[in-house]
């Protein structure tokens, strides 16, 4: 009879205690508590208390684990049947995660060349400067050309001008920065979500003049996924080197299956500082506004948006040209319609994207202290693109109409252009070798206005 009672006592051995935060001295709930080497465990209650029964009669190691705190273990050496260890305090730990990209189709983002460069998240925040070129200047194969800080333009693998493409979400940016060194890229980096430098076969998906590659910019526009509640975020910055400051604020408001997104940006930059002092007539002012609405469903989304960007900047003077410099005013308005759909009817393809875009760009150049524009440039671009995308392939088509208008002391005639394109991309893996192939067929008509005079 005594032997039986002894076994019962061993089986009912129990340990209890409390778990607290060493930082705040408050109780911790849902801490995982277990005996190493045994299938015995529990979790702490709201007051931090815990209790484990039927523990082994030998000495044992008791472990405590919860996200945000260091793993803690205590060794219990006692012959007592009822064990109370009092309070256990856990130390905070710093969580260090790799960058996480959230998207509707992360599996479709693997089609890229080893020579590609991608900046997003904290990387683009750390390297953010006023212009695209200045933000990318430390990347491999990137150089800068400029006529003042506002007009800085990237040089990609030694090529400039129209030897590579600048795109916004896969379609042309819509400005005239490639036509002259004093034309600024119509982009403020405070609104950029990511920048991708694309080389190799995949570059043909964006256009035909991609000898050096493509720089594709994705802005903080309509997100791929709907927020569960209203969300606000912003970016502020300043520099005492050129007495500049900037701010960008974005607000998302979800309701039912819809979401409204609105954002505004402002940047003021003083004169560029050189080793010889301030370079006159190099200051700039950027202002922008974006508004859009999107509808989300289980297998897709549809959105429409409008964006406005104005840039007023100066070009420094030179003895060979305008001694006092040139002032330039630029305005670009972009309207977008986007439709994304998950598909199953087309083998090997998972998504279909349709995008319509209209860009109205205007650009006036003034001699400093003059009230009339010496040069007046503008263009209107209408684009319609459809694209099917799979894990290792893309096919699509593009229709684009462009109307170029020039006035003042500028002798390029007004011109109409029509571009029809068919493009495709395929990737195939053979053991340790990945092959990529792409093709693009374009039909382009250029019709300048003529005069009998």
Language-model segments: residues:
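Short strand-turn segments of transmembrane beta-barrel domains in outer membranes
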Residues: 219-253, 279-282
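Structural motif
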Residues: 11, 16-28
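Signature of Gram-negative outer-membrane beta-barrel scaffolds
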Residues: 393-453
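Flexible, glycine/serine/threonine-rich loop segments and coil->beta-strand junctions
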Residues: 109-131, 137, 144-190, 199-216, ...
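Short, acidic, small-residue-rich periplasmic hinge/interaction motif at the N-terminus
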Residues: 20-23, 32-34, 65-69, 81-125, ...
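Flexible loop and strand-edge segments within Gram-negative outer membrane beta-barrel domains
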Residues: 269-286, 299-352, 356-381, 409
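Transmembrane beta-strands of outer-membrane beta-barrel pores
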Residues: 219, 236-242, 255-257, 266-270, ...
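Short, acidic Ser/Thr/Gly-rich low-complexity loop/linker segments typical of extracellular
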Residues: 38-49
């Amino acid at each position: 009879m005594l032997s039986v009672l002894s076994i019962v006592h061993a089986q009912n051995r129990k340990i209890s205690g409390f778990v607290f935060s060493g930082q705040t001295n408050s109780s911790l709930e849902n801490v995982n508590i277990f005996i190493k080497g045994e299938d015995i465990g529990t979790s702490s209650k709201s007051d931090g208390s815990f209790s484990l029964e039927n523990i082994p009669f030998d000495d044992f190691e008791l472990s405590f684990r919860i996200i945000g705190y260091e793993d803690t273990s205590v060794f219990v050496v006692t012959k007592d049947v009822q064990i109370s260890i009092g309070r256990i305090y856990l130390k905070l730990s710093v969580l260090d995660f790799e960058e996480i990209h959230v998207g509707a189709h992360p599996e479709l983002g693997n089609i890229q060349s080893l020579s590609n460069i991608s900046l997003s998240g904290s990387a683009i925040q750390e390297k953010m400067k006023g212009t695209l070129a200045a933000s990318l200047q430390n990347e491999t194969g990137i150089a800068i050309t400029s006529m003042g800080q506002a007009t800085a333009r990237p040089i990609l693998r030694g090529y400039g001008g129209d030897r590579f493409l600048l795109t916004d979400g896969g379609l042309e940016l819509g400005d005239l920065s490639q036509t002259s060194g004093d034309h600024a890229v119509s982009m403020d980096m405070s609104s950029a979500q990511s920048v991708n430098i694309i080389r190799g076969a995949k570059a043909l998906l964006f256009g035909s003049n991609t000898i050096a590659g493509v720089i594709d910019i994705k802005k903080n526009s309509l997100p791929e996924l709907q927020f569960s509640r209203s969300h606000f975020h912003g970016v502020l910055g300043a520099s005492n080197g050129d007495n500049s400051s900037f701010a960008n604020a974005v607000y998302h408001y979800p309701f039912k299956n819809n979401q409204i997104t609105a954002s505004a940006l402002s940047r003021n930059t003083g004169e560029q500082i050189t080793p010889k002092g301030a370079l006159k007539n190099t200051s700039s002012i950027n202002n922008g506004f974006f508004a859009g609405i999107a509808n989300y469903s289980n297998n897709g989304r549809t959105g429409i948006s409008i964006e406005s960007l104005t840039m007023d900047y100066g070009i420094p003077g030179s003895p060979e040209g305008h001694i006092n410099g040139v002032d330039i005013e630029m305005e670009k308005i972009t309207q977008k319609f986007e439709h994304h759909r998950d598909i199953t009817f087309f083998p090997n393809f998972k998504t279909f994207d349709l995008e319509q875009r209209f860009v109205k760009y205007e650009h006036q150049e003034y001699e400093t202290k003059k009230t009339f524009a010496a040069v007046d440039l503008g263009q209107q671009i209408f684009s319609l693109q459809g694209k099917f995308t799979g894990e290792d392939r893309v096919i699509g088509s593009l229709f684009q109409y462009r109307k170029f208008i020039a006035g003042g002391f500028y002798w390029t005639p007004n011109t109409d252009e029509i571009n029809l394109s068919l493009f495709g991309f395929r990737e195939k893996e053979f053991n340790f070798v990945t092959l990529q192939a792409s093709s693009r067929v374009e039909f382009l008509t250029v019709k300048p206005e003529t005069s009998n005079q």
